[in-house]
Amino acid sequence: MFPRISQAAILAHSLLAVCTSAATLAEKVRGVNLGGWLVLEPWITPSLFDEAGDEAVDEYTLTEVLGVEEAAARLSEHWNTFITEEDFALIAEAGLNYVRIPIGYWAAAPLDGEPYVSGQLEHLDNAVAWARAHNLKVIVDLHGAPGSQNGFDNSGRRGPIGWQQGDTVEQTILAFETLAQRYLADDDTVTMIEALNEPHVPGGINQDQLKDYYEETLARVRKNSPEATLLLHDGFVQTEGWNGFMTGENVMMDTHHYEVFEGGQNAWSIEKHIDAACQLGRQHLQAADKPVIVGEWTGALSDCTRYLNGKGIGIRYDGTLGSNTAVGACGSKSEGSVAGLSADEIANTRRFIEAQLDAFELRNGWVFWTWKTEGAPGWDMQDLLANGVFPQPLTDREFPNQCNF
């Protein structure tokens, strides 16, 4: 039996820890992810996957279908053109201060017998140099682990979760160590490194073993930098559920916030979407005892984007995924520019973005997902900025005080 502790005492302790740890971060993180560049995702660049046929549903199967030579040629062209220094200049002009760059284990510590092609680290090197030139900071994000830590296509290979089986954790540590050695030593541009993106605890990842892995990654960070911040994804466990773990060690939590991946969310009113974002800030971010950022989030209010749930998989909004009841037809929400949405949809997207900015800046900031797509309304920051839907300056509000903080 544990003694009962008053809620007031718990809150007081939590707020003290929050104030103490939050003081270690000098400025708010206001960043954007470079998704779909060095780790492919079908919904961000559907053309790459359509050209490869139906069997190409993730980076693993894409490279497997194409073969080494053709895959290397196509991916090299993609890496050279999808993100360039001009993007970094535009990101800086928008008032952002961070870029989070996903990278897969296969780029840092490839495994024999797998079809992935390499060469990504040279482009990550370029990205760090471009960031430095434009006064941006970098979060290097280990986005995919051997066996897949979540079963999502953005881990490199969709399907069953196989991470923590066999020697996959040890292989992941090797990949992480390679990244830490390459990017943390003698560099003040890469100020954060993420241990692993979205390990899926509710999906079967063992949280105690995940904590052990996080401890191992911290040791690798400290071997290369006394000051770099280790970013820990919450594993889809409420962020404050990690309270008491690895406090006071330049460690920061990362939580991701989307309101489209559960069936009922696609039918929510804009008011309910806004309330959910505000509640995340008010209840969960404020309760964490370490600095915390929302490392992925979106302006999208539906899951209509083509391939968002996976290539060959349906959509909740239109009722083609599982037993979800249709909310309506996706229409212009599926692809193209945010400018193709109705006036009400554009206004609601702006409202939703502003509410999230307010909520997430209650703590240490945010990193929007993502900078660029081939046409995904609400997800593409470059498109949102060009159409006046993402605030400029970032503090501008057409819908102020939505959260009543």
From Swiss-Prot:
The catalytic site is made up of: 198 (proton donor), 296 (nucleophile)
Q: What is one cellular component GO term in this UniProt entry?
A: extracellular region
| Range of residues in the leader sequence | 1-26
Gene Ontology biological process terms in this record: cell wall organization; glucan catabolic process
Q: What is its EC number?
A: 3.2.1.58
The terms under GO molecular function for this entry are: glucan exo-1,3-beta-glucosidase activity; metal ion binding
Which domain of life does the protein's organism represent? Eukaryota
- Record protein name field: Probable glucan 1,3-beta-glucosidase A
Where is this protein primarily located?
secreted
**InterPro entries from the entry?**
Glyco_hydro_5 (IPR001547), Glycoside_hydrolase_SF (IPR017853), Glycosyl_hydrolase_5 (IPR050386)
Q: How does it assemble?
A: Monomer.
Known Pfam families for this protein?
A: Cellulase
Q: Which cofactor does it need?
A: Mn(2+)
Q: Where in the cell is it found?
A: Secreted
Reply yes or no: does the keyword Signal apply.
yes
Q: What does this protein do?
A: Beta-glucanases participate in the metabolism of beta-glucan, the main structural component of the cell wall. It could also function biosynthetically as a transglycosylase.
Q: What is the lineage of its organism?
A: Eukaryota, Fungi, Dikarya, Ascomycota, Pezizomycotina
Q: Which residues cross the membrane?
A: none
Q: List the disulfide bonds.
A: 278-403, 304-330
